[in-house]
Design a protein with these regions (language model features):
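N-terminal pre-Walker A segment at the start of P-loop NTPase domains
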Residues: 1-19
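Conserved inter-motif catalytic segment of the P-loop NTP-binding fold
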Residues: 14-15, 19-21, 25, 35, ...
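Phosphate-binding/switch region of NTP-binding enzymes
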Residues: 31-33, 37, 42, 55-57, ...
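Hydrophobic positions on the alpha1 helix immediately C-terminal to the Walker A/P-loop
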Residues: 43, 47
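Active-site catalytic microenvironments for nucleophilic, acid-base chemistry
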Residues: 50-54, 296
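C-terminal regions of RecA-like/P-loop NTPase motor modules
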Residues: 117-118, 155, 200-326
Length: 326
């Protein structure tokens, strides 16, 4: 087929829905990640409930909480009742799956998704990715896993939101990028879209940032992150209460550790030294240098072209912040 024929055929298909804002689109594999205690699961449940309230059946595969823990979370303050979820929101009992090997766990998940798909259920949230494969820090393993996962869901024609995490050593004082996702590029290269939750330093607030989108323009970028707080309503539901948008660097300003050493590394990068050369000059490894330079650029909202790397980096054209991702 020619490209024109493919486009024309696609135009005849039913337009895909935006499942939640422009962060998750129908028939796409989307990742939500953040550090511990940022409210990833609370937000994922809120997303699932909103979709279910709009008439779509959603299955939430929860490998994190026991049924009692879930009950405790969503009961009201005086324990006389609980939040009444939509009947379209389904949560299978996965207690026995937790004791299986991760390979067996993944096999059972695919079987459940296939059975549900035959019944017309096409929207799934999985909390979280670590239970499906604990070896995602290995680049080769991560690539094999995510390619296999995406091929399975494409055959079924389903939409999946995967909950991820950041490596434990990551701190909240740096800007959110795809590099902060555990598994890094080996996962992020193959997902369709990605958004993340960050902490506002010094306040009991969080923010949402859009990091990748294949099918739409990125709206919640570093200049317009969505700020809010998680509050428990009187009816028992935890809700992300939106307060407006802000520049990410302002939420971290005065907290991000931009040291003289990082500034020196950035100046050397502007002088067209490679990451490896800068690392040898300063006495750290090249990955550290790259992270320092990205932090500096994100914090100061600047960009730089390096002829040695043949790569221009900056907030508006960094691979992590493309208008459309490829």
């Amino acid at each position: 087929s020619t490209i024109n024929e493919i486009v024309e055929e696609g135009m005849k298909a039913e337009k895909r829905k935006y499942l939640y804002k422009n962060l998750w689109i129908e028939k796409e594999l989307t990742m939500l990640f953040g550090t511990t205690n940022t409210g990833k699961s609370l937000f994922a449940v809120q997303i699932a409930e909103e979709i279910a309230r709009n008439g779509e059946k959603v299955i939430y595969f929860d490998y994190e909480l026991s049924e009692q823990q879930l009950s405790d979370r969503y009961e009201n303050a005086d324990r006389t009742g609980h939040y009444v979820f939509s009947e379209n929101l389904i949560r299978p009992n996965l207690d026995m799956d937790k004791y299986a090997s991760y390979k067996e766990r993944l096999k059972k998940l695919f079987e459940r998704m296939e059975e549900a798909s035959k019944l017309g259920i096409k929207i799934f949230i999985i909390d979280n990715i670590t239970y499906l494969n604990p070896k995602l820090s290995d680049g080769v393993e991560a690539s094999k896993f995510i390619i296999n996962f995406k091929s399975k869901m494409e055959v079924l024609g389903v939409s999946v939101l995967l909950i991820g995490h950041t490596p434990k050593e990551q701190k909240n004082k740096t800007v959110l990028t795809l590099d902060k996702l555990a598994g890094s590029k080996n996962i992020s290269n193959f997902i369709d879209s990605c958004f993340a939750i960050g902490k506002v330093e010094g306040e009991n607030k969080i923010y949402i940032k859009q990091l990748k989108a294949r099918s739409c323009a990125i709206s919640l970028d570093e200049n317009h992150v969505l700020v809010g707080t998680f509050t428990k309503r009187d009816d028992g539901l935890f809700e992300f209460a939106e307060e407006g948008t802000a520049m990410e660097k302002n939420l971290l300003k005065g907290k991000t550790d931009i040291t003289p050493q990082k500034e020196h590394a950035f100046k050397l990068y502007q002088e067209n030294y490679s990451y490896r050369k800068i690392a040898s000059m300063i006495g750290v490894n090249d990955k550290t240098v790259k992270a320092w330079i990205q932090d500096y650029i994100s914090y100061h909202n600047v960009k730089s072209y390096n002829y040695m790397d043949n790569n221009e980096i900056g907030l508006n054209n960094d691979n992590n912040n493309q208008l459309y991702s490829v």
